[in-house]
């Protein structure tokens, strides 16, 4: 099953948690001190909020898929359309280990295409982001990943 992924950076986690729980009509799927996630079935959405980012609002969008092969298919489809991006293998981010392919749309919105392999106890900070976190990649003008991102 594919899910649209939406990640919002918030100021007040508890206030936002209460709002989105009411909006979705369900309790969160995952709750941490700095991160909350809902896996909504109708519509199929992986919705997450987190603190720690100085800029509030939309952090990034994404497509969550069922396999590494599906991530590879997305990567190939995007590359065939002339869209360059960055692979991230075994990324530790948002309390999960995932295979990812990050791209940026023509308006600068970051898209995280990914398959989660397992849940983790660590929020982020893998070597791909220079140990600075995850979830908010920064692309240079060439469309390549910069290690300046953080959650």
Question: For the regions a protein language model found, what residue spans apply to each?
Answer:
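Short acidic/glycine-enriched loop/turn segments that link adjacent beta-strands
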Residues: 32-35, 55-57, 94-98
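Short aromatic/hydrophobic contact patches that present stacked aromatics
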Residues: 5-7, 37, 60-62, 100-102
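Vicinal oxygen chelate
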Residues: 13, 62-110, 118-121
């Amino acid at each position: 099953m594919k899910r649209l992924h939406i990640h919002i950076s918030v100021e007040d986690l508890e206030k936002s948690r209460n709002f989105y729980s009411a909006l979705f009509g369900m309790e969160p799927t995952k709750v941490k001190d700095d991160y909350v996630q809902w896996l909504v079935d109708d519509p199929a959405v992986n919705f997450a909020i987190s603190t720690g980012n100085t800029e509030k609002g939309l952090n990034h969008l994404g497509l969550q898929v069922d396999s590494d092969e599906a991530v590879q298919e997305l990567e190939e489809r995007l590359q065939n359309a002339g869209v360059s991006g960055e692979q991230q293998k075994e990324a530790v981010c948002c309390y999960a280990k995932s295979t990812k392919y990050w791209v940026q749309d023509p308006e600068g919105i970051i898209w995280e295409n990914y398959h989660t392999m397992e849940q983790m106890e660590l929020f982020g900070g893998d070597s791909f982001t220079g140990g600075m976190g995850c979830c908010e990649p920064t692309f240079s003008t060439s469309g390549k990943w910069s290690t300046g991102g953080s959650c």
